[in-house]
Amino acid sequence: MPRVKRGVTARARHKKVLDQAKGYRGRRSKVYRIAKQAVMRAGQYAYRDRRNKKRVFRALWITRINAASREHGLTYSVFMNGLKRASIELDRKVLADMAVMDKPAFAAIVNQVKTTIAA
């Protein structure tokens, strides 16, 4: 049985990990064994935070909508309930963007909601 020379594949594997660890501090970017652990942990954080990002942004949108609707005398929950009753199908992302960037349009929506609630 011929002997297996693994120099090329080992070097390629090490290079791949060390390339992924570029920019890390100290031995985390220089030493394969430590870089491998750092890259693995970075991947775990990335996986976790891709899911957390969705929650964080939804919370931000809700906070912005709440702040903007309170300026017009409505709480977030009353405002969202009024939106559903008025059959206005705008998602939280769009509403939050309007609350920050386009205040007159948001005010118009709030007025529609107020008339729906009053009726």
Swiss-Prot record:
Biological function: Binds directly to 23S ribosomal RNA and is necessary for the in vitro assembly process of the 50S ribosomal subunit. It is not involved in the protein synthesizing functions of that subunit.
Family, similarity comment: Belongs to the bacterial ribosomal protein bL20 family.
Lineage: Bacteria, Pseudomonadati, Pseudomonadota, Betaproteobacteria, Burkholderiales
Gene: rplT
Protein name as it appears in the record: Large ribosomal subunit protein bL20
Entry GO MF terms: rRNA binding; structural constituent of ribosome
Source species, domain of life: Bacteria
Any one cellular-component term (Gene Ontology): ribonucleoprotein complex
Keyword rRNA-binding annotated: yes
UniProt keyword annotations, A-Z: Ribonucleoprotein, Ribosomal protein, RNA-binding, rRNA-binding
Entry keyword annotation includes Transcription regulation: no
